[in-house]
Amino acid sequence: MAIKTYGLMGVDWEERVNYERLRNERLARIKKLLKESEIGALLCFDMTNVRYITATHIGTWAMDKLARFTLLPQDDEPIMWDFGSAARHHQLYCPWLGERSRAGISTLRGAMLPAAGRAEDVARKIRIELEARGLLNEPVGVDAVELPVLFALQEEGIKVVDGQQLMQQARLIKTQDEITLLNSACMMVDAAYDELYRFMKPGVRENECVGLVSKVLYDLGSEHVEGVNAISGERCSPHPHVFSDRALRPGDPAYFDILHSYNGYRTCYYRTFAVGSASQAMVDAYKRCRYILDIAIDAIKPGVTTADIAKLWPKAEEFGFPNEEAAFALQYGHGVGLSIWEKPIFSRLVSLDHPEVIEEGMVFALETFWPASDGWTAARIEEQLVVTKDGCEVITRFPAEDLLVAGVRYYTASGPLPTTRETQSQLNTRANGYLAEGSKDQEALLQA
């Protein structure tokens, strides 16, 4: 076990996460890639990219606003524009930014009237900094942008190009501290699944499961519970990707995806359970789901490509979908870092013709799905892993090698009720021969 799990607080007697090293290594990585590119400066509005470059964070409420932005010029330090009070806070508490933390705001996704000139103000600020460094005639890579801001940048004579790929490349290989944070985030979900397993029983609703998981994570120190997919019963196939208020019933399948952030670093972590018991169809589906996941994990090592992995997975037509686009993200892999989905992507839709090489230090999740033969149950499993020099290490540790049955164990007069059984009781009595013509059980029942 090479990847260590530490306590979450800072101590003087053990080096855990070194946040100064984390900040410096992230910034050095994107600076190096920027220097090697044809881009003169990077302009980022996506909060995860802003955090990667500047190590600033003002809460998840701002994630969809595209209002905060940072400029990273060639051979220079990043400049950060933020909400006024946040900018002042950064000056006081983020010494690595100092006076390069400035007040500035975009249009709040169009909430401010165009006549207010906020888009033009953003563009003017960027032009001034580029001119001061002799970069105005160089391309500026932008990761995501509001259209009014894009048009205003172009009006200022700035050539805007795609900056997403450069940022994705920077975030592709994780530093040692990023890996520690990702491992810590997974540790929290291990604990959440343990509580969830004890909690599930008939009558518990999907939304209650979401509430329990969220509380466990926040109590452990989660920064943000991005989502908990809680899917049960006949909702399992096809996968709806959202929880409801449906109550669990005896014999239900139930699968969950827990997505949260610890100091910015995410989890994507599926587990499947049966409530009380599982049908044979469900057991078989789980075994198939686990098998196609395991053959992928076993193949992971540096030098292998995403195409090599995607080829191991069944085609869409083999599990009920007309094509790979229709089945996208069911047999799937994706990088995990400051975002849930980063490079590299593993999918038969794109990877077979456009493979990416797996490298040491990548962190990604592999997830598989298999619908049961009964037409309504299904299994979903996901493991998050770190690529090592000669293979990989899985950092999602809640047991998943076999289908777990949650809830109380039921007992009959003749002993424990089997955990593999059909949800309809009469199907189990028939299977046991109770109703067979001329059987001893039938004769005894008739005489009674």
What are the roles of these predicted feature ranges?
Residues 1-448:
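Active-site neighborhoods and metal-handling regions in enzymes and metal-associated proteins
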